[in-house]
Amino acid sequence: MLPPPVDPTVRVRPPAGKRSDMDLTTALDARDATVCVVGAGGKKSTLFALADRLDRPVVTASVRIPIFDDRVAAVRVTEDPVTALDEADEGDWPLGLVPERERSDRYLGYDTETVAEIADAAPGATLVKADGARLRDFKAPGEHEPQIPSNADVVVPIASAHVVGEPLTEELVHRPAEVAAITGRDIGDEIRPADVATVLASPAGGLKGVPGDATAIPVVNKVDDEADAAAARAIAGEILFRANVPRVILTRLIADDPVVEVVE
């Protein structure tokens, strides 16, 4: 029996390639790059995991950031970060740069123009927290988010695998109404892998504000067991189908080797 004719109007997902031999800095193209993290469920962990593995990196922010003095060698609170870079000693790396301590538990961030100046002056990678998520695992950006400098090389949209199967509510999701608008789902609906992928791959979601010459490399974090891995692989496959990104990184950022899998 002959196979049925192929309908040329139907798009078929090609099988995704998988590998686990890529380290985090290579997977995120982070060496000597300006890397901006957005989304929820692993932004700060990504910044610090990269900072631990790169040569003379800067950690900074264009939005509020929790106190991180214990995650870097030194923090300079300064309105003149370029001078602080020039004056940094060999023992100051990774170096944190922030403009002001807003309260006991967080710093303010610089405007994007200043972050761009930091990146231009930095001797290595500049790692930037570029939006907030209020400790949730999944989000869509607000009206004035993200805050990405124009010279960003890599933008990393992040979500946690743990949201799959959970309800679309404020308990785990920052701005669930915006997520619902992007995905066409209703508040309270069960979050599917396709919903996470839709947000991460959307110009109104994870790809919002990505400069034209920057590379977006999505991350699905908190891949803690095989169920999480299955959900993360499904998310990754959908992202690769929907968006022009080179790969999706599956991570467990609290692990010594944080890359679980690279899906290309």
Residue ranges, per PLM feature:
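N-terminal phosphate/diphosphate-binding loop that engages ATP/GTP or pyrophosphate donors
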Residues: R19, K44, A49-R106
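Beta-strand->loop->alpha-helix junctions that form or flank phosphate-binding loops
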Residues: V59-R64, R242-A255
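Hydrophobic alpha-helical segments and helix pairs
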Residues: E90, G96-F138
